[in-house]
Amino acid sequence: MSWLNKVRNALPFTPKRDTPDNLWIKCPSCSEMLFTKEYEDNLSVCPHCDHHGRIGANARLEQLLDAGYELLPAPKVKEDPLKFRDTKKYVDRIKAARAANPHPDALTNAFGRIEGQKAVVGVQEFAFMGGSMGMAVGNAFVAGTERAIKEKCPYVAVTAAGGARMQEGILSLMQMPRSTVAISRLHAAGLPYIVVLTDPTTGGVTASYAMLGDVQIAEPGALIGFAGQRVIQDTIREKLPEGFQRAEYLHAHGMIDMVTHRRDLKTTLAQVIDFLMAGKAAA
C-alpha cells in the first residue's frame, strides 16, 4: 500500500451536509447573490441596488397592517362557467394555482389598522395566475369595499396583475365596470379609495380600479401600463422614451401622486388616511 492510500484511509469520513435550495436568491436587477432570509427581512428589497422584488399577499399584509388584523373570507363564485380549455383545462389551472398559494384566488382582503388607522386592505397575489382579474377577484373587490363602508374606513387596493383573466372571457371584463361601481359607492359613503401600484400592474386592472384612486401611490420601479411596450412601439412606429411605463416616469408626467419606498409605505398610508379621514372623524 502506498503512502497516498495510507493518508486517504486515515482521513475521517464527514457526511455531506444538506444545504437548502432556497438559501440564496439572485437579485433580478443587479444580479448580486443575497441570503434569502436577509432579503426577506429587508422587505424583499435588494440592499445593493434597492430593487423592489415581488412579494406575496401574506407578506404584504404583514408589512402594512398592525398585529391582529382580520382576514376576510373570499366570496364564492361559479368556477369555469365557460368550460374553457387551452393547452389544459381552466379548472386544472385553478387547482394548480391553489396548490401553490395560501389563498383561493388572486385578491385577498383584510380588515385592520395601519399604524392605528382603520382600513380594509385588498392585496393582489401576482403568483396566482399572474394576479389576473376574474369573477373571484371582482367579487372580492366588491366585498372589500362593502366592508369598508360598513366599518366607515378607507379601502386600500394593492395592485399586482397582468390584466383580465382570459379563461373567463367577457365575464372577466365585466369586473372592470363592477369595480368602478363599487368605488363610486365608496365615494357616495364619503370614504376614500387609495391605490398602491406595485410591479407589475397592467392590462384591464390598470384600465379600471388601479387608476381610480383618490390617492395614487407606487413603489419604485413598478411597471404600470395597459398594453406592452412592444405592442405600443409596433403600433405607433416610434421608439418609446427611457423608463416609459415605470413608476418614476408616470409620477414625472402627473399620472400618479407619489413614489414611495416599501419601508416607508406603511407610515405614508397612515398619514394619508389620517389626513383624508380627519374631517369625517370630527363630523
Curated annotation (Swiss-Prot):
EC number of this enzyme: 2.1.3.15
Family matches, as InterPro entries: AcCoA_carboxyl_beta, Acetyl_CoA_COase_Trfase_b_su, ClpP/crotonase-like_dom_sf, COA_CT_N, Znf-ACC
Record-linked PROSITE patterns: COA_CT_NTER (PS50980)
Similarity-based family: Belongs to the AccD/PCCB family.
Keyword vocabulary terms for this entry: ATP-binding, Cytoplasm, Fatty acid biosynthesis, Fatty acid metabolism, Lipid biosynthesis, Lipid metabolism, Metal-binding, Nucleotide-binding, Transferase, Zinc, Zinc-finger
Chief location of this protein within or outside the cell: cytoplasm
Coiled-coil stretches noted in the UniProt entry, renumbered to this chain: none
Cofactor: Zn(2+)
Residue ranges covered by zinc fingers (C4-type): 27-49
Cofactor note: Binds 1 zinc ion per subunit.
Protein localization: Cytoplasm
Catalytic activity of the protein: N(6)-carboxybiotinyl-L-lysyl-[protein] + acetyl-CoA = N(6)-biotinyl-L-lysyl-[protein] + malonyl-CoA
Domain of life: Bacteria
Role: Component of the acetyl coenzyme A carboxylase (ACC) complex. Biotin carboxylase (BC) catalyzes the carboxylation of biotin on its carrier protein (BCCP) and then the CO(2) group is transferred by the transcarboxylase to acetyl-CoA to form malonyl-CoA.
UniProt KW Nucleotide-binding keyword: yes
Pathway: Lipid metabolism; malonyl-CoA biosynthesis; malonyl-CoA from acetyl-CoA: step 1/1
Name of the protein in its database record: Acetyl-coenzyme A carboxylase carboxyl transferase subunit beta
Organism per entry: Novosphingobium aromaticivorans (strain ATCC 700278 / DSM 12444 / CCUG 56034 / CIP 105152 / NBRC 16084 / F199)
